[in-house]
Amino acid sequence: MVSSFPFVYQNMLAKRPYGAYQNVITVSMSWLKIHGSCPHRITDALHRNAQIIPVLEQWRQQGNQVNPSHVRVIIKKLRDSDQSLQALQVSEWMSKEKICNLIPEDFAARLHLIENVVGLEEAEKFFESIPKNARGDSVYTSLLNSYARSDKTLCKAEATFQKMRDLGLLLRPVPYNAMMSLYSALKNREKVEELLLEMKDNDVEADNVTVNNVLKLYSAVCDVTEMEKFLNKWEGIHGIKLEWHTTLDMAKAYLRARSSGKAMKMLRLTEQLVDQKSLKSAYDHLMKLYGEAGNREEVLRVWKLYKSKIGERDNNGYRTVIRSLLKVDDIVGAEEIYKVWESLPLEFDHRIPTMLASGYRDRGMTEKAEKLMNSKTIKDRRMNKPVTPLLEQWGDQMKPSDLKCLIKNLRDSKQFSKALQVSEWMGEKQVCNLYLEDYAARLYLTENVLGLEEAEKYFENIPENMKDYSVYVALLSSYAKSDKNLGNMVDEILREMEENNVDPDLITVNHVLKVYAAESKIQAMEMFMRRWGTEDGIKLERGTMIAMAKAYVKAGLTKKSGRGVW
């Protein structure tokens, strides 16, 4: 334990730290010689997730001095381990106890923590309290990063960036990256390219983040020519490393541009770049895209990797591989994998047999589809109610709040059929008055366990005075996930919402736009966007923007895919 402590901090410092702290935090070699020291006590406290300030106070009470560098390391360690509140407390303690004269990087770190823990408004107040002579580029960059997280604070981000420009603080790529990230989210390509030109004029070298952000933007708008030109310029330059998310987006762009050969190269590169923590997500994406590229062998190869490294106890993997095999017209392969899934004791996922049945119907195999959906196995798994006997035994003794908590816990652990059983039992036994969120939760669970058709039937039986935005969002979410053409159904739901004076919210807007985009209903998509997309609090998700861009490309409106025309 004694000898391992310094290496913990050396490994931590080897990672790229936040802001300019990378030049401030240093670990003294004398730590290697100290036994039972303050750093060792702190390490022990960190391992136990204990409070750090009492350790520091005790060290001082014993007549010892606290090294400011050690405190900065502690703050960073806490922040990196998602203990922002305690990191903020240590930062405030360092200031209150006057451990040292604070430098701009100390203020920058604290500003970031305040925004993370308390919110942007308090962070702005703290910024105003920072002495002007301590407001260096690290402080302004921290404030800029806070503003650049949302399009609601676009004006403040631009004003802060201009202030940094006026003060001559735009000497590193970090502030440029913050603005590029914001403009990319808004699909404002012109602004991103203006910033690239400004960086070039000011001799500010692009870094890894810059290159990946720009490539993702060109991928999203499907400008393969500019994407390749930019990649060729930076590929192979020291310090520039492509992220697997970037190469995956580039592969998608190539597929939309019908360059399957180039897409395949990018997908193979993605496999080389993906890290261990992201394997599950990456394999899901890879199987899907290899399927879109029409490569059955690659789908099965990645599925083999998925099983060996992730395991077979996961519905998501089976959904992805079956969908991908159907995409490459391998109905036999899809059937074989379905039989394996059917034999496993996984939570029943109606989408898997429904997907295979749809594959049968698409190929004119209607009888086979009906036989599958009416098979004893599916009926048994749908009607399996192991929770019901327990509810009959002790359910009446539970408070309504306990039952709702049970539903939430079952839902969070993806035991959807059991969660639905509890929800149905509550309704049948009338153990309490049901509220809006109860109906929304049951609608969501019904769609996940029994399918969209049953969810629609349940929706029709919900009392009109209980159909608020959460209920409508649950139904629209089901439509957005469906492979069927449901644009007309969405139109009906929107009309009903209007009659009931229920305005679309952030989630509703994104779901509706995805449905319209999936069906290439350009006019309906643009009309809905013009009406609701600019309302306060409405922000398009990246997935929504990509879906809309794909719809434009599919409709031959390539220019619109790269501009906010609505």
From Swiss-Prot:
UniProt PPR repeat ranges: 136-171, 172-206, 207-242, 243-273, 279-309, 314-348, 349-385, 468-504, 505-540
InterPro entries for the chain: Pentatricopeptide_rpt, TPR-like_helical_dom_sf
Keywords tagged on the record: Repeat
Gene3D superfamilies: Tetratricopeptide repeat domain
Disulfide pairings: none
GO molecular function: mRNA binding
Pfam family, one: PPR
Keyword RNA-binding tagged: no
Superkingdom field: Eukaryota
GO cellular component entries: mitochondrion
NCBIfam families: PPR (TIGR00756)
Family: Belongs to the PPR family. P subfamily.
Entry protein name: Putative pentatricopeptide repeat-containing protein At1g28020
UniProt source species: Arabidopsis thaliana
